[in-house]
Amino acid sequence: MTGRLLTFADEKPAEPGKRTDEVLVGISPAFADFFSQTITGLSHADVIRQILAGIEEQEVSARIVRVRHSSDLAVVAHTAAKLSGSGIAIGLLSRGTTMIHQRDLPRLSSLELFPQSPLMTLETYRQVGSNAAQYAKGESPEPVPTLNDQMARPRWQAKAALLHLKETEQIVQGAKPVEVIPQFAQALATN
């Protein structure tokens, strides 16, 4: 099977953005590091590509920061939003749970929340990027349409709990966010 691989390079301390036309993407400790795909098997490389494409389509710049001090989505997203020049950020956990946050909102609030990661598609991630970019431009986009499956929670709860435990094991207490640059590669075919 072939697929995309994703690594992050050039880790440097994340600094507050100076551009008012940027969206930060905050990734969790294990994203494209300990884990390489979401709970349903979407590659992290494809997820990041789609989010960045959605941002780029709106002609807004993007940066990515890794938040190592927490595996809580609200903390990841709000930390990134506080560093974003526009005040808008996307938080992204390894299992695929996503949130669009704004710097001046309380940490546990958000502009848009996508809690059912098993229902996220690559198209949804692209729309998340697009909406975040529209918020960064001062627009009020229609919320990204989401699916709702009452059985998703019981069906995926055990796996989600295990993934969260593994993600939490990757936390580095007191670590400051670092800015990272994505590097994409094509995986080799295996038999």
Feature roles, as predicted:
Residues M1, L42-D46, Q50, S71, ...:
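Conserved active-site and cofactor/substrate-binding residues in soluble primary-metabolism enzymes
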Residues K18-E22, V60, S84-G87, V180:
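Short coil/turn connectors at secondary-structure junctions
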Residues I39, L108-N191:
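C-terminal binding/interaction regions
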Residues I48-A81:
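Active-site rim loops that border cofactor/substrate pockets in soluble metabolic enzymes
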